[in-house]
A protein has these predicted regions:
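Short, non-helical or kinked segments that cap or interrupt transmembrane helices
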Residues: 27-48, 93-106, 187, 232-245, ...
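Cytosolic-side transmembrane-helix boundaries in multi-pass membrane proteins
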Residues: 193-207, 277-330
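Transmembrane alpha-helical segments in multi-pass inner-membrane proteins
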Residues: 230-301
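Hydrophobic alpha-helical segments embedded in the membrane of multi-pass proteins
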Residues: 15-24, 40-44, 83-86, 192, ...
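Alpha-helical transmembrane segments within multi-pass membrane transporters and channels
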Residues: 61-111, 271
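Membrane-interfacial amphipathic/re-entrant helices at transmembrane-helix boundaries
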Residues: 1-22, 34, 48, 57-72
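Transmembrane helix-bundle core of multi-pass membrane transporters
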Residues: 110-180, 282-295, 315, 322-330
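Helix-loop-helix "hairpin" substructures at the membrane interface of multi-pass membrane proteins
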Residues: 156-234, 257, 262
Length: 330
């Protein structure tokens, strides 16, 4: 039962960054801009958020007000991710550069920048920014008495509970409402489907595309912090390819919030199963095969490729995504 509780709670924990980053990609691509740079946005958001947590830890504010400090770090992650996404927007919208190449360049820049910044602040050779233990939400956070011995519900709720999870729930609901229940969402989707028609009725396509890219940066930055917290080993100037996995989640989810949510849980579950492969009796052990655990660690990425092979043909991407908008081409 304890393993089941851990698997469920870890699945939620690892689904959160996938959900946030995939939703960010959804906003950008519905506006008409392909966002390959989600990985870089995650790295930049996580970098500055972890520096913020480290500063709060040293000042004593973090241990005294852990969730306020965590909320501030989440906002820093979102803000820095937004700033970083501006470079993609400028290249793709103003300069009309190839969006895939621009995103790839930002992805290459982000980890190198993170290493340099980490060395500059912590000292050369120190590439890991530790995550303080007080960021986790515990029973004590709610004034509840500690539990003696193992408890299914305690493991399920509190073992891997961070503020990023309720924040992700709020942002998911907000993303759905904004995308499908507001005039802004309608205009954003119009710019990704028929930008010339949108322009003809007075919608500023450039502004809406910038909005989509900046929103993706905000969500991507928070997703970077969520991944770093979930990984538990501190920030190491990368996010384990989660930005690219989030792209797969977005495509598998057909650029829609609820399918993206289901896809996030699906892929996160396979990642957790890989982590617990040695403890799960129903998984084949392949006696005599060396390092079988490495196979299970590859499983989430193998599943990703298989799923995309069978679902990509039915995916309906925004019609004008990746096509620079030229007002004079109407």
């Amino acid at each position: 039962m304890m393993i089941a509780a851990n698997i469920i709670s870890l699945t939620v924990l690892f689904a959160v960054p996938l959900l946030l980053v995939a939703l960010g990609g959804m906003f950008s691509e519905h506006s008409g801009v392909i966002n390959i740079a989600l990985e870089g946005m995650m790295i930049i958001g996580a970098l500055f958020a972890c520096f913020t947590l480290q500063a709060f830890d040293k000042s004593g504010f973090g241990p005294a007000h852990p969730q306020l400090a965590m909320l501030a770090a989440i906002l820093v992650a979102g803000l820095t991710g937004t700033i970083f996404s501006f470079f993609l927007g400028f290249a793709a919208i103003n300069l009309k550069a190839d969006q895939t190449i621009g995103g790839t360049a930002l992805n290459q820049f982000a980890p190198a920048f993170a290493v340099v910044m980490t060395w500059a602040i912590q000292g050369q050779g120190l590439t890991t920014i530790a995550i303080p233990s007080w960021v986790r939400i515990t029973r004590d956070t709610f004034g509840l008495a500690p539990v003696d011995g193992p408890s299914f519900w305690n493991n399920l709720i509190f073992k891997y509970f961070y503020l990023t999870t309720p924040v992700a729930v709020v942002l998911f609901i907000a993303a759905y409402i904004v995308m499908y229940k507001t005039r802004f969402g309608l205009r954003l989707r119009a710019c990704g489907e028929h930008p010339q028609a949108a322009d003809s009725v007075g919608i500023t396509v450039y502004t809406m595309r910038y909005a989509g890219v900046l929103i993706s940066g905000f969500l991507g930055g928070i997703g970077g912090l969520a991944y770093t917290v979930a990984a538990g080993s501190g920030f190491n100037s990368d996010v384990g390819g989660y930005g690219f996995l989030a792209l797969a989640v977005m495509i598998f989810g057909n650029w829609k919030p609820f399918p993206i949510l289901a896809s996030s849980v699906f892929f996160a579950l396979f990642k957790v199963i890989a982590a617990y492969s040695s403890s799960l009796s129903f998984l084949p052990k392949f006696e005599g095969v060396k390092e079988i655990s490495n196979f299970y660690q590859m499983l989430p990425y193998i599943v990703t490729m298989i799923v995309l092979i069978f679902t990509s043909k039915n995916s309906q991407a925004p019609k004008a995504e990746g096509i620079p908008y030229d007002k004079g081409s109407r």
